[in-house]
Amino acid sequence: MSHHRGLTVAAGLWPTFVVVDAQDRAALNTALLPLLLKTWEETSTGSEHYERVAHNIFAFENPAVLALKTIVLDLARRHYDLGDAFELEGHEIVSQDRQFIKTHVDSEEGDLTLQYFVRCPAGNAALAVNQFGNAAFVLVNPAQPAGSFRFPNEQHHEYPVLPRDGLLVMYRSYTPHYQCPYQGDAPMVQVVCNIKLKRVSH
């Protein structure tokens, strides 16, 4: 005679790991800003963020860019084993008044993505980082797409980060994200950095 024993398993699967790193990087931003604005003017082909000539700022032999590269890779290596077989690509994002970024993922460009904020709304610096507001950068739970139902005991779908000068956000590239509308006179400037590990062919 066989006996059947019941089994119940509950597992919180697939968490998303996010790092928010806010430091005083005023000197770096002062050096980066004119270079990024100049590059944007030379490569932008339209009013939308994606309308641009493809380029990689990390190919520039510029001291400020090299300093940013060091910061980005140091933070990434602090949390992930990158090894030596990877590529780092980055480009500037310049936002004008009322401009925003729609929900998307960066998994075609990288495995690990970092957003570095160079010039942000001045009022954001006095506010808490984890909240919505002017040009808030928002990460969306990849297991619960925007618009899906959330039970009261489930975590929120979204994690907002309020940009400020010198702030870095690091997340896996498959994580959906968007940016709320920016309000301001001077263009907002940030750099998106994608780290893509090289695949081993068998």
PLM region spans:
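A short coil-to-beta-strand element that immediately follows conserved catalytic motifs
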Residues: D81-H91
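Catalytic core of non-heme Fe(II) oxygenases with the double-stranded beta-helix
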Residues: H91-M170
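Catalytic core of Fe(II)/2-oxoglutarate
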Residues: R150-H202
